[in-house]
Every structure is written in structure tokens, then in C-alpha cells.
Amino acid sequence: MTVQLTTLIVETTAGEECPVEFLGDSADIVYFISMAHTERYGADHPLAKAAAVLKRQLRVNMAPLLNFADARVENEEEERLLERLWQDAAPVAAAARDVAQAIEGSPQLRELTADFPELPARLRELAEMAAWAAERGAKVRLTFVI
């Protein structure tokens, strides 16, 4: 039996392989951005609460991180959705960096994300990947597998 881990996939249009990679499990980012989507509906999960603090109290622009979808497609409509996910890399880099910095700098956010202690490190790695793409004028796409 093969066990597939939840993974964030970061693709670029750079035409070359990004030399930066995740140094640990990227599932924490997938869980965080997924819960950030549910925050507007009053989700009670600690990651959703962290997203609410980031968005509403600290005014961190998380929008570029919330532009993602399942990498597996089952029909043409989902394929079109994946194509619409390409976005400028610099805002993704800034958002990932800003969220990581906010988590590290806030006792409240550290407490809310305590079950995901590597989240800031993974976000910084994502920021490095996106910055690398931005330096090349490339776009990025965030997808995941579960």
C-alpha cells in the first residue's frame, strides 16, 4: 500500500527547475491555506483563527496564497481552473514572507499555529521559490495533492 502525503506543489513558468525546495513537509501550508479559506465562514479551527488574526487584525495580504486548487483534475472545467491559477510570483513571495514573519512575531499566532511548528519555515521556503521565479519574470501556480 502506497501512502501519499499531503503536498503543496509550486510550479513556475521559468523554463528551468527552481533550485529552492521545501526542506520539510509542505502539508502544513496546505492545511493553513485551506483553513484560511474557511475562516470567513466562522470556522473554529486554530489555523482558521490564525488566518482571521492575520487578515483582520494585522492586515496581512494573504490573497496570493489563497489562489490554489487540487492538482488532480477530473474534467475540462477543472483543467481550465488550473490554467487560471497562474499568478505573478512577487506577490506570492511577499505574502508568504509576511505571514511567516507575523506568525514568528506574535505570541497569539504562535499559539494558534503550535500544532504546525514548521509552518513559518515552510512559508519562508515558499517565499524563496516565488522570489526566484519573480527574478526571472515567471509566474507561479500553487496546487496540492492529498
Locate predicted features.
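Acidic (Asp/Glu-rich) sequence patches and key acidic residues
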Residues: 1-146
